[in-house]
């Protein structure tokens, strides 16, 4: 039997099979060809992700406690990581669509964390992937 931890859609007790939502594979984004427009798209997506994570953090804090909600807080901090933001900006300047730039840069960072010899840091690779997928 597998055990999982997550946030319920509705409070209470449920009986039945659990469903784990997995985001579908990436759509093929098309760059507008204008790096400034792509950067603006990215900035808007980051702002939306920040709002989503803020709401999720507040819900998790109430339902799971501050310690477990800290995972969401870590993702909110990642949205401000200069290395990540500069990596995305460089990819956009190189002609990438905002979505590709965000996802590819996130994957590069996640791979670095996944390769570390520390279990805690390995787990952060999933947080990085979740954060970059939340943006797009």
Q: Where does each model-flagged region fall?
A:
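Non-catalytic, soluble scaffold/interaction modules
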Residues: 1-136
């Amino acid at each position: 039997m597998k055990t999982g931890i997550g946030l319920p859609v509705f409070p209470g007790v449920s009986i039945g099979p659990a469903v784990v939502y997995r985001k579908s594979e990436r759509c093929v984004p098309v760059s507008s060809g204008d790096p400034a427009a792509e950067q603006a798209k990215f900035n808007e997506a980051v702002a939306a992700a920040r709002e989503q994570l803020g709401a999720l953090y507040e819900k998790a804090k109430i339902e799971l406690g501050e310690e477990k909600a800290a995972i969401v807080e870590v993702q909110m901090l990642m949205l401000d990581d200069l290395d990540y933001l500069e990596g995305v900006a460089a990819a956009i300047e190189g002609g990438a669509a905002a979505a590709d730039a965000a996802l590819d840069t996130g994957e590069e960072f996640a791979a670095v964390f996944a390769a570390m010899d520390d279990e805690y840091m390995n787990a952060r690779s999933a947080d990085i992937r979740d954060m970059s997928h939340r943006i797009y």
